[in-house]
Amino acid sequence: NLAKTLAKAGAKVGLLDADIHGPSIPTLLNTKDRKPLMDGELMKPIEVEGIQTMSMAYLVERKQALVWRGPMLSKAISQFCSDVKWGSLDYLFVDLPPGTGDIHLSIIQHIPLSGVVLVTTPEEVAVSDTRKAIDMFQNPHIAQNMIGLIENMSFFQPNDDGKKYYIFGQGGGQQLCDEAGIDFLGEIPIKENKTFANLEANYLSITGKIVQKLSILAANQ
């Protein structure tokens, strides 16, 4: 949805689904039945809503499980970076799986990242996993710019009367940011009709903060 917000604003946006074992971007964008075409020796991304997308889900059968070890995962990430005709982009979002493993290290190796945006939900199990991800990205041997953290499914808002129900607990994301010294970018609520349109204000606010931080980082490089 952050990619959608930037594309709607006129930016040239790419979205790489780096979750090799559990790719979800094609399902979220309703492109799971499409297949990439070739342009010479390069694959052409699947374009949807102004976003150039690539995912392992485009390349394998829907029910096929990829039981791959680290070297195969790293090779797949390398090919997504070098064998896809991304073209000239303003932003490339990389959707990573949870955890701290080979895929994350491969992305850092193959793509010069401008920064990292973390997403968590409020409950302690998710916050604990996100805490480990922060530790990885702040490791001196990896050292990535931390843009900040988004808390998804922060509260349930059944209607427009403003009343909020904190189903999964309250404040986990903010507390984690305070501990780690990173910025809290905002909350995404659960709504009965959770569409891009009725959450667009949330995404615009968060995207604005991300773009501002990226601009500051670029100016300081």
Located regions from the model:
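Switch II (G3) loop of P-loop NTPases
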Residues: P36-M38, M56-M72, S78-S106
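Amphipathic alpha-helical transducer elements in NTP-driven molecular machines
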Residues: G22, G70, S74-S78, E124-R131, ...
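Generic secondary-structure signature for well-ordered alpha-helical cores
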Residues: K8, S78, S82-W86, N139-I142, ...
